[in-house]
Amino acid sequence: MAENTTTIAFTEEQEALVVKSWNAMKKDSAELSFKFFSKILEIAPPAKQLFSFLRDSEVPLDQNPKLKPHAMSVFLMTCESAAQLRKEGKVTVRESNLKKLGATHFKKGVIPEHFEVTKQALLDTIKEAVPELWSLELKDAWAIAHDQLASAIIAEMKPES
């Protein structure tokens, strides 16, 4: 059984920046999650092919019934994991969920480099959502948090056993 026992160096200041910005964004998380996902597709249009509910859809993104719930779950998981990183010292997504996420990403043909796109989309979304809080320090804190979650998923990207 794979365990994510790596303790993460995430400073108190980084945690405070992430928590403060996440608290400021939470109330708009439905709208922001859609923006986040739209940015992924803007940065990497071929990513649309990775999602069965988008692949052959002619429906505009904002009218796709499956996109918003998916975007919301990805955005919330990313942000909640980031906010818990220092307190827990590791990614707080349950191991069974990480295994499922890893297997699903593997099956869909996701490669580690794809997570750079999600990181850029996340940072762009946060920068637009809380411009008054945006700084190099905030960017770095969110980048570290994203990379920790991405690494945990990538570690589980293998065929289901």
Swiss-Prot record:
Quaternary structure and partners: Homodimer.
Annotated tissue distribution: Mainly expressed in root nodules and leaves, and, to a lower extent, in roots, stems, flowers and fruits. Accumulates in mature root nodules.
Catalytic activity: Fe(III)-heme b-[protein] + nitric oxide + H2O = Fe(II)-heme b-[protein] + nitrite + 2 H(+)
Pfam families reported in the protein's UniProt record: Globin (PF00042)
Matches recorded under Gene3D superfamilies: Globins (1.10.490.10)
Gene: GLB1-2
Entry protein name: Anaerobic nitrite reductase Glb1-2
Result of knocking out the encoding gene: Normal vegetative growth but slightly delayed flowering and reduced pods number.
Molecular function via GO: heme binding; metal ion binding; oxidoreductase activity; oxygen binding; oxygen carrier activity
Binding residue positions for heme b: 52, 66, 70, 100, 104-105
Lineage: Eukaryota, Viridiplantae, Streptophyta, Embryophyta, Tracheophyta
Globin domain: residues covered: 9-158
Site (Homodimerization) location in chain: 139
